[in-house]
């Protein structure tokens, strides 16, 4: 069958790589993709992921059987709805169901209604109300802007001054807009991907841990993710089971109950508190860079899993008996302003590197985004995989990239 992947980043690179391995898949297309994907897929950078008509026309011309949507924006914009209305099979939720990521308030209200464990929250609609709220709230407090923010719309404020600064960032020159304040939760964060079709929810039996902060020791601003690893040895199978029972199954039923038919992967960003696992966020798609490490470890056929889910079967994931560590190299300055167009070399176009922000200029690759390339390390355990990942990092040549030196350290310290 012919499969079309939508998106241009490392997550989509990993999806295309994994789908290309399937015996069920004849051809993988990617729109818009990036040139690093050309060994495994037919890439069409001339079509934008926001060009719904162009994507639809292409899918018709190429007799595409399945469309797999990687990023959140096309889901929120209703690309899945348009494709389904024209008879295409789509892995990814419709516009209504994608609100679970598109609106933090939408997600909080559903969790509140169905008693799904999460932090207490307060919503405000005006800047002046936000400034009033922080006069009497407990610190630290988590400040979240409603809507999509590429993983960067969350600020943890330790003081009232930091909270004021966060409010200024969220509102800018505007006086109105939804901001959600949450009680700060302490504990160990982890990411659980769950395949969902209506009330059928099948969680991965392998979790990943992301590293959101820009710099070592979890310092600096939030980013889209500076690295990830799996499995997470210090979070037990019992926690995974509990997360499934108290979060994954209830949210699938709650969405259906509220009239939202979710089909695709639901990312559960959770935290293990002293009171058990609680939800930090939901995403309506694979995490990035969690997808890259999880799909590298997945032994079974991703396309078969998607078909099983579509047919309402409880699919069984199989995993390689190894650990995976992924280290992200980003443009200096990210997640704030950064320069583009700097040469990057030294890496191979294979499963050891997944490209997020590079484009071809003549025969060389140059930077085109904030997060640039993820180096993948593999090993019998997290320690060996970490060493392998940083060896892969050392092969990359560029004066304009930075990376964290402590990806997966937590697993080694907490063993």
From Swiss-Prot:
Keywords: ATP-binding, Ligase, Magnesium, Manganese, Metal-binding, Nucleotide-binding, Purine biosynthesis. InterPro entries: ATP-grasp, ATP_grasp_subdomain_1, PreATP-grasp_dom_sf, PRibGlycinamid_synth_ATP-grasp, PRibGlycinamide_synth, PRibGlycinamide_synth_C-dom, PRibGlycinamide_synth_C_sf, PRibGlycinamide_synth_CS. Its EC number is 6.3.4.13. ATP binds at residues 134-191. One of its GO terms (molecular function) is metal ion binding. Gene3D superfamilies: 3.40.50.20, ATP-grasp fold, A domain, ATP-grasp fold, B domain, Phosphoribosylglycinamide synthetase, C-terminal domain. GO terms for biological process: 'de novo' IMP biosynthetic process; purine nucleobase biosynthetic process. Its cofactor is Mg(2+); Mn(2+). Binds 1 Mg(2+) or Mn(2+) ion per subunit. Belongs to the GARS family. NCBIfam families: purD. This is Phosphoribosylamine--glycine ligase. It comes from Staphylococcus aureus (strain MRSA252). The lineage of its organism: Bacteria, Bacillati, Bacillota, Bacilli, Bacillales.
């Amino acid at each position: 069958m012919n499969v079309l992947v939508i998106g241009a980043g490392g997550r989509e690179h990993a999806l295309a790589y994994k789908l290309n391995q399937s015996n069920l898949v004849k051809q993988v297309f990617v729109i818009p993709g990036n040139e690093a994907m050309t060994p495994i897929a037919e890439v069409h950078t001339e079509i934008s992921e926001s060009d719904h008509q162009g994507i639809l026309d292409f899918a018709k011309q190429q007799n595409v059987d399945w469309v797999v949507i990687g990023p959140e924006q096309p889901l929120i914009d209703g690309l899945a709805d348009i494709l389904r209305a024209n008879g295409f099979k789509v892995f990814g939720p419709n516009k209504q169901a994608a609100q679970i990521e598109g609106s933090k308030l939408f997600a909080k209200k559903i969790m509140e209604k169905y008693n799904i464990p999460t932090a207490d929250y307060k919503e405000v609609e005006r800047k002046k109300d936000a400034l009033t709220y922080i006069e009497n709230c407990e610190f630290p407090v988590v400040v979240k802007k409603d809507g999509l923010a590429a993983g960067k719309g969350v600020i943890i404020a330790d003081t009232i001054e930091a909270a004021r600064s966060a409010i200024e960032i969220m509102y800018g020159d505007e006086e109105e807009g939804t901001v959600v304040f949450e009680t700060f939760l302490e504990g160990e964060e982890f990411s659980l991907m769950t395949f969902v079709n209506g009330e059928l929810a099948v969680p991965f039996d392998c979790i990943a841990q992301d590293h959101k902060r820009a710099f070592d020791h979890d310092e600096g601003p939030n980013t889209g993710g500076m690295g990830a690893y799996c499995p997470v040895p210090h979070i037990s199978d019992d926690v995974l089971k509990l997360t499934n029972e108290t979060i994954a199954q209830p949210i699938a039923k709650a969405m259906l109950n509220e009239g939202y038919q979710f089909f695709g992967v639901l990312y559960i960003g959770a935290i293990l508190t002293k009171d058990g696992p609680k939800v930090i966020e939901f995403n309506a798609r694979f995490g990035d860079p969690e997808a890259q490490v999880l799909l590298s470890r997945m032994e079974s056929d991703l396309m078969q899993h998607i078909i099983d889910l579509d047919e309402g079967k409880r699919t069984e994931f199989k995993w390689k008996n190894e650990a995976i560590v992924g280290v992200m190299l980003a443009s200096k300055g990210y997640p704030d302003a950064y320069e583009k167009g700097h040469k990057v070399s030294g890496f191979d176009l294979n499963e050891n590197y997944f490209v997020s922000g590079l484009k071809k200029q003549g025969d060389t690759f140059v930077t085109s985004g904030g997060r640039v390339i993820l180096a993948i390390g593999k090993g019998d355990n997290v320690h060996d995989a970490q060493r392998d990942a940083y060896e892969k990092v050392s092969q990359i040549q560029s004066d304009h990239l930075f990376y964290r030196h402590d990806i997966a350290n937590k697993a080694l310290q907490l063993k």
